[in-house]
Amino acid sequence: MSCKKSARTREKLLTAAGDVFVQKGFRDATVAEICARAGANIAAVNYYFGGKEALYQEAWRHCLAESLRAHPPDGGADPAAPPEERLRERLRALMGRIADPETKDFFISQMEIANPTGLLEEVMMRELIPMREKTLAMVRELLGPDADERQVVFCEACIISMCVHPLIMRRLGQKTPNARMPVIVDDLDAFADHVVRFALAGIHASRTPARAS
């Protein structure tokens, strides 16, 4: 098999695996279905990856790389821009990733949290922690030198939750239109602007000592 053909087959397997894992999760996905979708011999998974478990890990990493290519985590912000602008673009990029119907890694991660296999724990930590550290650094910068680490983590958790939960509900509503779920986000740009304003206002409020009642 030529190197080019081998690389194409591997790429097709990763793409097919991402589709199957995001639809069915790890346990219900089968090697046979993945190979059939990829147009590959059923022995191809063992040949290229050594088994379903390693394919799961590599497929998630491949899906993440694809979504980050489409939605760079920094949102294209100038590294020298003020922290407010850098945080704004970072949050808009995150929300764009989650809202994008082509994004698979995020929803594979959600399925892994709901039904853990333990197979993605190491690779997720290796890939996601550096991105989280950059967000924490921006929040830390915005809170100022007097902020303690607990305050930084609390603010970051609230901000990311505002980005994630409504867009998960939006995706669920799109997938199950007959469920008549309440519309939370009907305008992604307007929602992103709102989240950024709310986040920056919350950070500003956290910097201001609470008045004694």
Positions of predicted regions on the chain:
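Hydrophobic alpha-helical connector segments
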Residues: 72-104, 152-159
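Amphipathic alpha-helical packing segments from all-alpha helical-bundle domains
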Residues: 68, 85, 117-143, 190-193, ...
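Hydrophobic alpha-helical bundle segments that form small-molecule/ligand-binding pockets
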Residues: 80, 129-153, 176-179, 203-211
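N-terminal intrinsically disordered/low-complexity leader segments
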Residues: 1-8, 175, 208-213
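Amphipathic alpha-helical segments used for helix-helix packing
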Residues: 100-122, 170-176
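Short alpha-helical scaffolding segments that buttress acidic/His motifs in well-ordered protein cores
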Residues: 91-94, 106-113, 159, 163, ...
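Helix-turn-helix
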Residues: 12, 20-54, 58
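Generic hydrophobic, amphipathic alpha-helix propensity
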Residues: 9-18, 34, 59-67, 135
